[in-house]
């Protein structure tokens, strides 16, 4: 029973992506430790000691003389879920090695009452972020279809939104696929077919890391776009190619550099360990930079908006435009990484519980919020949907009399309506580009 709890806890704590079943991954790591033990024992001179060096399927024991006690730390393979550090020992007797003492599970802390609460916490977190990513994926897909279907919605702003939606969708897909592989309980394991199949695991991790980084950089692009909209003289549509290079290009270069450092410095396992600091910083530093830059853009945008809203030269329609933009910006920019600033400066392990709740639970619903704000609450989108709905209603049987009635009622005012239409001006570029909500 305890062994199953240990394995379950180990599987839940494999938060990095892997294309190998967790139980097979567990056995593969055991095999790696066994290989290291064999190499270590072969290099040691036993000198006909009473107890030869041995691998007991969990720990490596060096040669010893009769009466000698050998003490080793808890096995490294279980280090992901130690509740406390501990040691285990064996005595060398005339009959050979004694049983391990103290009890392996007790010594390494697996019977700690906190373990069950931790497992419950991880199960709850997984359920929440699975729901969040699923709902986000459905809402983002719906929003993308809506924007693509209506030609009047095709503009630079919405093209950027579509790329942001795609980055959120890829992020959700990578997480859901990763979990379906890691936590699948169906089928019979065939671990003997998988030793050495680290290539697929590494490719999955590369895809996962790329989706995460691309998502951060498209959030940065949204911040850059809003900032450019406020300060630039030229239309920001001319910067769209640069936005594409930032959103998809920079993550590609950074992931390529990370792969190179992994291959040269830490090409071990599934690339989900961080024993060497350089590969870890190569993948983490670009994300930290995007978070900091986006936070700086947020501060700058708020400052510019406050200046424009309090300026005596701004009045009437312009002021309402800036108020609408202020509402949109203040709702959206905090989603673009401001909450990540809370944990960006903290080392790994500090306030890990709160960080998990923010990044997994809150972050999983981020795509849903962005889809609602950028698409479903967008006045242009709502107008197009209403227009399409009215068109569908008019094509239904029984609507002919309604159309004739509407035509006769509108004919009397057609000339005045035409005059109003001719006298109206086209909306300004700023108004058309900032009608987010």
UniProtKB/Swiss-Prot annotation:
One Pfam assignment: 7tm_2
Glycosylation sites: 57, 87, 91
Cross-referenced InterPro entries: GPCR_2, GPCR_2-like_7TM, GPCR_2_extracell_dom_sf, GPCR_2_extracellular_dom, GPCR_2_secretin-like, GPCR_2_secretin-like_CS, GPCR_2_VIP_rcpt, GPCR_2_VIP_rcpt_2
Covalent S-S links between cysteines: 37-60, 51-92, 74-108, 201-270
Signal peptide annotation: 1-22
GO cellular component: plasma membrane
Keyword Membrane: yes
The keyword Zinc appears for this protein: no
Regions of this protein lying in the Cytoplasmic compartment: 150-157, 228-238, 304-324, 378-437
Membrane topology reported for the UniProt record: Multi-pass membrane protein
Swiss-Prot/TrEMBL keywords: Cell membrane, Disulfide bond, G-protein coupled receptor, Glycoprotein, Membrane, Receptor, Signal, Transducer, Transmembrane, Transmembrane helix
Transmembrane segments: 124-149, 158-179, 203-227, 239-260, 280-303, 325-345, 354-377
GO molecular function: G protein-coupled peptide receptor activity; peptide hormone binding; pituitary adenylate cyclase-activating polypeptide receptor activity; vasoactive intestinal polypeptide receptor activity
Oligomeric form and interacting partners: Interacts with ADCYAP1/PACAP (via N-terminal extracellular domain); activated by PACAP27 and CAPAC38 neuropeptides. Interacts with VIP; the interaction results in VIPR1 activation.
Name of the protein in question: Vasoactive intestinal polypeptide receptor 2
């Amino acid at each position: 029973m305890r062994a199953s709890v240990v394995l379950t806890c180990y599987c839940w704590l494999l938060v990095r992506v892997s294309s190998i079943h967790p139980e097979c991954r567990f056995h593969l790591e055991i095999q790696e430790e066994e290989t290291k033990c064999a190499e270590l024992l072969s290099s040691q001179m036993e000198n006909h000691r009473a107890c030869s060096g041995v691998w007991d399927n969990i720990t490596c024991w060096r040669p010893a003389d009769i009466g000698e006690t050998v003490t080793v730390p808890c096995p490294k393979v279980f280090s992901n879920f130690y509740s406390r550090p501990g040691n285990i020992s064996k005595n060398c007797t005339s009959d050979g090695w004694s049983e391990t003492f103290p009890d392996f599970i007790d010594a390494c802390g697996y019977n700690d009452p906190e373990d069950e609460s931790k497992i419950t916490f991880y199960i709850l977190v997984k359920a929440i972020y699975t729901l969040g990513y699923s709902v986000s994926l459905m809402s983002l897909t719906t929003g993308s279809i809506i924007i693509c279907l209506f030609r009047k919605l095709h503009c630079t702003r919405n093209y950027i939104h579509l790329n942001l939606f795609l980055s959120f969708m890829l992020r959700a897909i990578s997480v859901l696929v990763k979990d379906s592989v890691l936590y699948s309980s169906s089928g019979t394991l065939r671990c003997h077919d998988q030793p050495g199949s680290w290539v697929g695991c590494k490719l999955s991790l590369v895809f996962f890391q790329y989706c995460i980084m691309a998502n951060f950089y498209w959030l940065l692009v949204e911040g850059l776009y809003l900032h450019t909209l406020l300060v630039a003289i030229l239309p920001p549509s001319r910067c769209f190619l640069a936005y594409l290079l930032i959103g998809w290009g920079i993550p590609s270069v950074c992931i390529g550099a990370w792969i190179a450092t992994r291959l040269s410095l830490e090409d071990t396992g599934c690339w989900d360990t961080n024993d060497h600091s350089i590969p870890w910083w190569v993948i983490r530093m670009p994300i930290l930079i995007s978070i900091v830059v986006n936070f700086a853009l947020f501060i700058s945008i708020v400052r510019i908006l406050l200046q424009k809203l309090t300026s005596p030269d701004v009045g009437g329609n312009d002021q309402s435009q800036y108020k609408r933009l202020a509402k949109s910006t203040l709702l959206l920019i905090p989603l673009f990484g401001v909450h990540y600033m809370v944990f960006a400066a903290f080392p790994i392990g500090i306030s890990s519980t709160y960080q998990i709740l923010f990044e997994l639970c809150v972050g999983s619903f981020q795509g849903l919020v962005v889809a609602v704000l950028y698409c479903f609450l967008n006045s242009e989108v709502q107008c197009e949907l209403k227009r399409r709905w009215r068109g569908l209603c008019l094509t239904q049987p029984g609507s002919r009399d309604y159309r004739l009635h509407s035509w006769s009622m509108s004919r009397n005012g057609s000339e005045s309506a035409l005059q109003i239409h001719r006298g109206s001006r086209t909306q300004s570029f700023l108004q058309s580009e900032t009608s987010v909500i």
